[in-house]
């Protein structure tokens, strides 16, 4: 949802970014205080990761954080991932950081940082009692639309986990997701798998598209699987 409309670049950079994200997120989740477990902390860590091409021995603040963690727990998942990232030379590491910064640029917007600073949605509890939750997006400005896809992705995962771990596999209250403008809210990773398993957890999904081609544009070969898991397909002629 943040790679833009251009062609996919070298897969190496995407994998390198993912490696760094894994290290930093693991540190934040397992070592950081609860109030700092958010996207803002991730962005700040990346912003503070200075790299000097002419001085391979230079260490930034994040390097020292991981050095301390490595001394306490050398087998920590975050430490092991960060060590792999540090295999990159100064020039390569700088390119990785630039790619991360460009991808996460929207999270530098003050309004978005405020939204990401704390959790007030409690998406995992939507099936505990009767609740109505609305996501409103602009139909002319797509800047923040990816947040809805992010929220949906987390919501489905959290609700399935809660159904399995707390309620024996089924939520006490059915959660019905009416996803209008599905083509304009970004892609939910693994949606083709999600739609196949949520029904048993008392979750249903209704997707609204202007045309079938919109679903295919977003999910490519998985679009057929997504549509195949829908009980009904309704077409309203223009």
Task: Give a label for each model feature.
Residues 195-238:
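Conserved ATP-driven motor cores of ASCE-family P-loop NTPases powering translocation/secretion/packaging/pilus
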Residues 1-203, 218:
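P-loop NTPase motor domains
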């Amino acid at each position: 949802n943040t790679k833009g409309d251009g062609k996919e670049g070298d897969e190496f950079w995407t994998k390198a970014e993912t490696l760094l994200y894994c290290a930093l997120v693991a540190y934040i989740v397992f070592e950081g205080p609860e109030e700092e477990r958010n996207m803002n902390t991730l962005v700040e860590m990346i912003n503070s990761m200075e790299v000097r091409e002419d001085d391979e021995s230079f260490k930034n603040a994040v390097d020292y954080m991981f050095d301390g963690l490595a001394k306490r727990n050398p087998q920590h998942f975050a430490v092991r991932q960060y060590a792999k990232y540090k295999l990159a030379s100064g020039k390569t590491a700088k390119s990785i950081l630039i790619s991360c910064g460009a991808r996460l640029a929207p999270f530098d917007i003050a309004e978005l940082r405020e939204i990401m600073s704390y959790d007030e949605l409690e998406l995992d509890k939507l099936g505990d009692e009767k609740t109505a939750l609305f996501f409103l997006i602009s139909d002319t400005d797509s800047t923040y639309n990816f947040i809805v896809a992010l929220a949906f992705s987390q919501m489905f995962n959290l609700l399935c986990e809660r159904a399995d771990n707390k309620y024996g596999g089924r939520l006490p209250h059915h959660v019905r997701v009416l996803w209008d403008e599905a083509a304009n809210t970004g892609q939910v990773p693994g949606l083709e798998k999600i739609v196949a398993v949520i029904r048993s957890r008392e979750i249903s999904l209704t997707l609204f598209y202007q045309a079938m081609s919109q679903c295919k544009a977003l999910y490519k070969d998985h679009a057929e699987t997504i549509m195949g898991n829908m009980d009904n397909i309704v077409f309203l002629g223009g």
